[in-house]
Amino acid sequence: MASQGTKRSYEQMETGGERQNATEIRASVGRMIGGIGRFYIQMCTELKLSDYEGRLIQNSITIERMVLSAFDERRNKYLEEHPSAGKDPKKTGGPIYRRIDGKWMRELILYDKEEIRRIWRQANNGEYATAGLTHIMIWHSNLNDATYQRTRALVRTGMDPRMCSLMQGSTLPRRSGAAGAAVKGVGTMVMELIRMIKRGINDRNFWRGENGRRTRIAYERMCNILKGKFQTAAQRAMMDQVRESRNPGNAEIEDLIFLARSALILRGSVAHKSCLPACVYGLAVASGHDFEREGYSLVGIDPFRLLQNSQVFSLIRPNENPAHKSQLVWMACHSAAFEDLRVSSFIRGKRVVPRGQLSTRGVQIASNENMETMDSSTLELRSRYWAIRTRSGGNTNQQRASAGQISVQPTFSVQRNLPFERATVMAAFIGNTEGRTSDMRTEIIRMMESARPEDVSFQGRGVFELSDEKATSPIVPSFDMSNEGSYFFGDNAEEYDN
């Protein structure tokens, strides 16, 4: 982006810091990661988890959820004011899985939130370390993005399920801050805005009074975040219109849906970060790795390196394929749910298959599932190459796309053609070009129609050998363009339910 000079890098957002140089950023991200690792080790000690149990991704997720719950101020306050039967607002917990006599057993644990906050602060040198909490939220969000489809949520807001590639970060909590906003897809922002406008249509007091003023500020801030994701002047001008509307209503919803569709070809800038489960950081800290001294980056080689030599396990249901479970977690670790499968396959060095062909359900185990038949296996999270994560949508280019997902949102800065079928996308634009945004709409449609096949994204960017940590000799992969590129193609994934 041209305005890069005024922007904080997303590592700075992640660590809440002001402008820093590269070394300082690496150190502060390292401090955040080290804090998560130390917290995890301490929790394993408290819960008396064996080494093997501490490497179980389901245990990691329970511990992560407990710390997020302990610091969820608004929900904690709500729980204290609206006591519900059988819920102690001061406690948090979840399932912990232990290996007993060659079988996996589930144990539901409860902990004082105060105690967890104390352990977290102690692991983070007495600081609140909100950046680490956000990092955990983004890992959970990336896992949801790879596991579930959001068809229902898309349809409910009047959008099209084929726009799923725009939905990154759709399950992130509101409190995820600037780092959270950076990883949200265009569709996610549009959906949040549409929900807000619909509330305003149904509730006449929504925009009024002192509360309404705060709502209005939030609305304009969300509009600005979305505007910042667009890379063309016409899309941004249209966002200004939506933001400045005196009384947002159906016209604004129409404009937002139009903009979301346009982002399938004129892609927005969406950040990607490799956020790993807490147990991976814990393992590294336990083996003596000093993240703050070594420095760490979420968008470079570091997460790949970490995954090359971490052994993480997962519970496996009777008819699940462990290799497929590994793919799911690998995609989540690298925020690659909406990446072109050909690019992911090349980097991973193993074929990455579409969601509909995976014989695996989500990573988390429901409380009513039978533990008797549960097995566990090692997750294969290693990669053949590494690539720099991107924060831009790249330029665009035509390619055959599918009935399910009709576009991708690149994760890795790797030179390639970006697949979408112009006819499919353009068919979505029949009709409405009147109203006060007509000239912008016309301009956006013109740009979409003239997107040329020879515009490849990320000119000259490639992947790197894992021994090439300074990214000196890029390998530009060649892709078989006849293969299917979309992950959610012909999909049968479960819906995401809170």
UniProtKB/Swiss-Prot annotation:
Keyword line: Capsid protein, Helical capsid protein, Host nucleus, Host-virus interaction, Ribonucleoprotein, RNA-binding, Viral nucleoprotein, Viral penetration into host nucleus, Virion, Virus entry into host cell
Keyword Protein transport: no
UniProt key word Chaperone: no
Pfam family name, one: Flu_NP
PTM: Late in virus-infected cells, may be cleaved from a 56-kDa protein to a 53-kDa protein by a cellular caspase. This cleavage might be a marker for the onset of apoptosis in infected cells or have a specific function in virus host interaction.
Disordered: annotated segments: 1-21
Motif Unconventional nuclear localization signal: chain residues: 1-18
Compartment list: Virion; Host nucleus
GO molecular function: RNA binding; structural molecule activity
InterPro entries: Flu_NP
Gene Ontology terms describing biological process: symbiont entry into host cell; viral penetration into host nucleus
Gene Ontology cellular-component annotations: helical viral capsid; host cell; host cell nucleus; ribonucleoprotein complex; viral nucleocapsid
Principal location class: virion
Motif (Bipartite nuclear localization signal): 198-216
Function: Encapsidates the negative strand viral RNA, protecting it from nucleases. The encapsidated genomic RNA is termed the ribonucleoprotein (RNP) and serves as template for transcription and replication. The RNP needs to be localized in the host nucleus to start an infectious cycle, but is too large to diffuse through the nuclear pore complex. NP comprises at least 2 nuclear localization signals that are responsible for the active RNP import into the nucleus through cellular importin alpha/beta pathway.
Assembly notes: Homomultimerizes to form the nucleocapsid. May bind host exportin-1/XPO1. Binds to viral genomic RNA. Protein-RNA contacts are mediated by a combination of electrostatic interactions between positively charged residues and the phosphate backbone and planar interactions between aromatic side chains and bases.
Family according to the record: Belongs to the influenza viruses nucleoprotein family.
The protein's name: Nucleoprotein
Organism: Influenza A virus (strain A/Swine/29/1937 H1N1)
Gene assigned in the entry: NP
